[in-house]
Amino acid sequence: MMWNYFVTCIVLYANIISIHTFGLTGGNNLNQALGLTGGNPLDSTLGLSAGNAFPSGMGAMQIPAYLRMAPSVETICSTQSPLLNPRERNGLLSDLVGKEISRRSRFLAANPSLAGTGKWACAANYYSNVMRYRPNELGNVFGDLIDSTGCDGFTCDMVRGVRKTSPMSNFLNAMMISQMMQQPNAAQVPTTSQQQPTSNTGGQQPPTNASNPPTNPQPTPTPAQPTPSGTQVQQTPAANNGLDLTSMFNNPAFQEQLMRLVST
């Protein structure tokens, strides 16, 4: 009895040394050499008789908690963009986006939403899974994109890829946003048709004096007053086909889009 216990201890110790040196296969080879066909005692003790050194889900790549809780790169870019000087904005945003994409680069292929939503997720998916950029290249690719387009100056679809938005499209979008945001400032006056009162005389006109026909006094035209110099003539929205240029150019959304157009 003591001899069996002693042999078992020696085998366990040899298995531990073999596994530490050669891995799990070394322990199995030692058992076969010693004639222990029952398998590796250490394997049965640790519950690894199925041949897997780790549980099935442990080796999978998981997103760290600090990345799951952090805002997306799109949110970071759009938040910092209004705070920067327009002349240096794209360059600073390029560095910022490149660093944030590099932190998430290993997980973007499976989780493009880490980059953002809409065209940002599309760009991450396109660069990772279609263009097959390596994780260490994604930061530079996104940085070059933001340097030339800004946070919103690009479009993306999985067929045509990532493309820069044309400047004319940005200008038209700015005008559309400005028109949607401005309030109507001209009251509409309903037009009524003036009808001459007619008397019910059975369809007969009253007799008139043929010798002295009535005459209607003609209004005398008033002379046009000259406009004094230095006085600005203010145009109404109706004079510009319903487009209030003053409100449009004073709209912050239009000014931001116009600055992006000039910077690109």
UniProtKB/Swiss-Prot annotation:
Highest classification ranks of the organism: Eukaryota, Metazoa, Spiralia, Lophotrochozoa, Mollusca
N-terminal signal peptide: 1-21
Biased composition (Polar residues): 230-247
Keyword Transport: no
Name of the protein this chain belongs to: Uncharacterized shell protein 13
Key words of the record: Glycoprotein, Secreted, Signal
Protein location: Secreted
Superkingdom field: Eukaryota
Species for this entry: Lottia gigantea (Giant owl limpet)
Gene Ontology CC: extracellular region
